[in-house]
Regions:
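Transmembrane-helix signature of 12-pass secondary carriers
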Residues: 2-491
Length: 491
């Protein structure tokens, strides 16, 4: 293999040539990665990295199911407004963490960042268990959110760049849908730990937050063997390392190197200048940026507004005690997980544009319908939960597709930051405002007021469906470099 100082045109690893006087590499690594069959390597990568969504599901569910315990805690004694504020602090941390860590992920590499972000999450969620008042609780939730937000950018980027093209849609949807496995874990944990015959209220909620820290330690060990993204390495001046990793992946898949894989020429660079990032996001790719923003904002408001406050709806409107709320999240979580699993393959076969439009539109219509049944008071706690289960069967696939869209329709050099920007803006618009707004609506005690909030969420989803139908990119089964040409690519 040629070293970085080899003469122009020398070989820089199997399937690529490096012209180091101009720092140009001709490589077939992206095409080789996309041509692979699914293997144990891909399963291990998806498991070790995708577990981030399980952690987020655990955290968000605990925030919801523990709300009653936090109100009853002799130490904290939170109001509904306090709970809404703390939920918004978590989301605000996720927004800022996504932007900061997203920029670092594109600059320093995927692997470094998914250890840094996981470490922050571990420390912050453990610290949450030691909270002594609203300020400390909100601060630790903010830091936990920052770790999770950073995880989203680093992990989404890595998975997109490692998974073969024909599996990308379904894999991404299932990984995002695994959020709800974490939600189920959180619900069951809350059922056990909030049982006052077993533990006091003030001890139970603290132990619940330690579950995330323990799970995070296991994940940390699982990630130690995962390599850096070969795509990132090639562009950032490490073609030899990229070639070696690609060869190892092919060997683990027991698949010979593709003999006629398409090659692309890339001008290697240490980093992408910020002006080029901004120019690409809001110049060359401004239409895709608009689509990403609309999809992310709509699903964030729809999801976070309802999910962060569902426990309050059950306790305040249906009289469910806080120690029984966890049982109601289980069918809700099942619908949310099954949606991406059962609908996910259609995003690769029928196509992104049709399926994103359908899932967003159906979600909006179903929420409006179930909201009407809520306002006329014909639902019980059980039928309300079943209605949410049906609504979010489609909404979960829609939300997962929003992450899929922003992670595959922008160039490799800005992929993590693009995910971060649209996650941050979308969550800032839809997620931070949503829980606080719905918390205030629930505090009014008026079904009519809460129904207006549901209608707002439904309207946002229908608007997003219209935008998707008009502007979504047909990225199904296509290589990432064909969906969005790398900024470093030359003819």
């Amino acid at each position: 293999m040629a070293s970085a100082g080899a003469p122009a045109g020398s070989t820089g690893g199997e399937g690529q040539k490096v012209q180091t006087c101009e720092r140009i590499v001709e490589t077939d690594i992206p095409a080789r990665l996309d041509a692979l069959r699914w293997s144990g390597f891909h399963t291990r990568v998806v498991t070790a990295l995708g577990i981030t969504w399980i952690l987020d599901g655990l955290e968000v569910t605990l925030a919801g199911t523990l709300s009653g315990a936090l109100k009853q805690s002799p130490t904290l004694q939170f109001s509904n407004l306090d709970i809404g504020f703390a939920s918004s602090a978590y989301l605000a941390g996720a927004v800022l963490g996504a932007i900061g860590f997203g920029w670092l992920t594109d600059r320093l590499g995927r692997k470094k960042l998914f250890f840094i972000t996981l470490s922050l999450y571990l420390m912050a969620t453990a610290a949450t268990a030691l909270s002594w008042n609203l300020a400390s609780y909100a601060l630790f939730r903010f830091l936990t959110g920052a770790g999770i937000g950073g995880e989203y950018t680093a992990i989404n980027s890595t998975i997109q760049e490692m998974v073969p093209a024909r599996y990308r849609g379904w894999t991404d949807l299932v990984i995002n849908g695994s959020f709800w496995l974490g939600a189920a874990m959180g619900a069951v944990s809350a059922i056990v730990l909030l049982d006052t015959s077993f533990l006091s209220v003030d001890i139970g909620w603290r132990l619940a937050y330690l579950i995330g820290a323990v799970l995070g330690l296991i994940v940390f060990a699982m990630r130690l063997w995962i390599p850096e993204s070969p795509r990132w390495l090639v562009i950032h001046g490490h073609p030899e390392r990229a070639a070696a990793i690609a060869a190892e992946i092919e060997a683990s898949a027991r698949q010979p190197r593709a003999s006629r894989a398409a090659k692309i020429k890339l001008r290697m660079r240490a980093f992408t200048p910020l002006r080029e990032v901004v120019g690409s996001l809001f110049g060359s790719y401004r239409q895709r940026a608009m689509v990403g923003l609309v999809l992310m904002a709509a699903q964030a408001f729809f999801y976070n507004a309802i999910f962060f406050t569902y426990a309050l709806v059950l306790t305040d409107f249906y009289g469910i005690t806080s120690d029984h709320v966890g049982w109601y999240i289980l069918p809700f979580a099942a619908g949310n997980f099954l949606g991406p699993v059962l609908l996910g393959r259609l995003f690769d076969s029928v196509g992104r544009r049709v399926m994103i439009t359908v899932t967003y539109a159906v979600s909006g219509l179903l929420l409006a319908g179930s909201g009407y049944l809520f306002v006329i008071d014909v639902l019980s706690a059980q039928t309300q939960t079943m209605a949410w289960m049906i609504v979010f069967f489609f909404a979960s696939a829609a939300a997962s597709a929003a992450y899929l869209t922003v992670s595959e329709t922008f160039p490799m050099e800005i992929r993590a930051l693009a995910i971060a920007v649209f996650y941050a803006i979308g969550t800032g618009i839809g997620g931070v405002v949503g829980p606080a707004l719905f918390g205030a609506l629930i505090d009014t005690g008026s079904r009519q007021s809460l129904f207006l909030g549901y209608l707002l969420g439904a309207a946002l989803m229908l608007f997003a469906a219209a935008v998707a139908w008009r502007y979504c990119v047909a990225a199904e089964r296509r290589p990432l470099e064909a969906v969005a040409r790398p900024l470093a690519q030359i003819d």
